């Protein structure tokens, strides 16, 4: 049995492992860390967890073990990726209509390139603790017209 409903490649599978063809694949946002649903730090004000971290968290942190799969939450185009001292290994995907998603602190980035088209559920990297991080997790940020907004406006916990 699967831990939660999730995307695998372009198929939506229920927690029982059954494919659900009724889910409109191109029109929904999906959970970025299949099988892991614990949010260790939510969007919004928070105490600084470590030096260099913000007291206003501009995303959500999903607890998962080092190496767990990170997937795109929606179809789009890889806008940028690489390493940043704060974000660690990161990928930024443009989804159109001013929406972009950013995935941070990954142990490594999957075989992607700038301009590459991705679908919801495409593997883009693997959970890690690079950059300013206190342990293995995925930080997911959502930008609307260049400003961070709550990821809960787009995704829901499976």
Where are the predicted features?
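Short peripheral tails and domain-boundary helices/loops at the edges of structured domains
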Residues: 12-14, 107-108, 143-158
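SH3/SH3-like beta-barrel fold
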Residues: 1-2, 93
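Short alpha-helix capping/helix-loop boundary micro-motifs
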Residues: 64, 109-112
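Zn2+-dependent peptidoglycan hydrolase active-site motif and core
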Residues: 55-58, 72-108, 136-144
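Active-site-proximal beta-strands of protease catalytic cores
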Residues: 76-79, 114-131
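Short, charged beta-turn/beta-strand-edge "cap" motif at the junction between a beta-strand
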Residues: 6, 84-86, 124-132
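Surface-exposed, glycine-biased beta-strand/turn segments
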Residues: 7-89, 120
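Residue-level recognition of beta-strand microenvironments
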Residues: 42, 81-82, 106-109, 127-130, ...
């Amino acid at each position: 049995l699967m831990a939660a409903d999730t995307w695998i490649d372009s198929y939506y599978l229920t927690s029982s492992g059954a494919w659900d063809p009724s889910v409109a694949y191109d029109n929904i946002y999906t959970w970025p860390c299949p099988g892991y649903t614990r949010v260790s730090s939510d969007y919004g004000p928070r105490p600084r967890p470590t030096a260099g971290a913000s007291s206003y968290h501009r995303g959500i942190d999903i607890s998962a073990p080092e190496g767990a799969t990170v997937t795109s939450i929606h179809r789009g185009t890889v806008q940028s990726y690489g390493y940043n001292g704060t974000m660690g290994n990161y990928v930024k995907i443009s989804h159109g209509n001013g929406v972009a998603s950013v995935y941070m602190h990954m142990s490594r980035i999957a075989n992607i390139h700038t301009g590459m088209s991705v679908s919801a559920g495409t593997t883009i990297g693997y959970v890690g603790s690079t950059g300013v991080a206190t342990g293995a997790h995925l930080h997911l940020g959502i930008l609307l017209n260049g400003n961070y907004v709550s990821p809960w406006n787009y995704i829901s916990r499976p």
